[in-house]
Amino acid sequence: MKIVDIHCHLGPCKVFDLDTSEEALMGAIQKNKIDAALVLPFPGAPDVKKIHNDIAKLMKKYPKKIFGVVSLNPHQDEKEYNAEVDRLIKDEGFVGIKLHTIGHAISPLATDAKKVFEAAKRHKVPLMIHTGAGIPFALPSLVIPMAKAYPDLPIILYHSGMAHIYSTEAYIAAKLCKNIYLEGSWISINEKIWFVGDLGSERIVLGTDLPENTAVEIFQYRSANLSDKDLANVLGENAIKLFKLKI
């Protein structure tokens, strides 16, 4: 059974006062027998280009195990934004793009957010969006109009509204939009069981966010009495299909 963690970070963050070293990241991956991990900078990275380049180096160091995700502040010139996205996806092989609502102070409905959706559509890669902490920008419901406007774009709600804050709203968003998938880091095991049971295991993906949380997220799904098929879907198969991973 493959395990794919679609939400890992590398480097420092000035917004949330966090710092995940390569040693901490790879230690959690190896200790928890993760087959592949999607890695991105924190929103408060003091030098985001350096961190993206560090992730690209990790991809070469750990081929078929580490995959990069683009995470750029959308509040910049559109040509500059697109040029960096193009470089990372075309030249470095990154497999997704993130819109960090709270970290970059942006609503999914904002004018500057459209370039993020358009970039994901153009490159045919999934778009991940931070939800939960950071209201009003991080409301899961704000993604609904954009998911309907981009029906062929897979959109993953990181945190699924987060720890009872807006998890029900994330569920409603996924219920209304078949192209919305839920990543459940920091929500409870009861919510995870509910999502799998009601939405179907094909709509849920594993993400852990921080090395300290890796074992917890995996254990919750393994202790949820899911069928072998449902567990395999959530832990890895869905991510492999969504991101077209060759592992």
Predicted regions and their residues:
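Mid-to-C-terminal alpha-helical segments outside catalytic/metal-binding sites
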Residues: 1-6, 18-36, 122, 201-203, ...
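Histidine-centered catalytic micro-motifs
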Residues: 3-12, 102, 128-132, 160
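Conserved, mostly hydrophobic/aromatic
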Residues: 7, 29, 55, 88, ...
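A general structural detector for well-ordered alpha-helical segments in enzyme core domains, enriched
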Residues: 21-28, 51-58, 81-88, 112-116, ...
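Active-site gating/metal-coordination segments in enzymes
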Residues: 35-36, 46-128, 134
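Conserved residues at the C-terminal ends of beta-strands
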Residues: 40, 100, 207
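Active-site-proximal loop/turn and secondary-structure-junction residues that shape catalytic pockets
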Residues: 43-44, 72-74, 101-103, 133-135, ...
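Catalytic pocket-lining loop regions of alpha/beta-barrel enzymes
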Residues: 92-95, 106-205
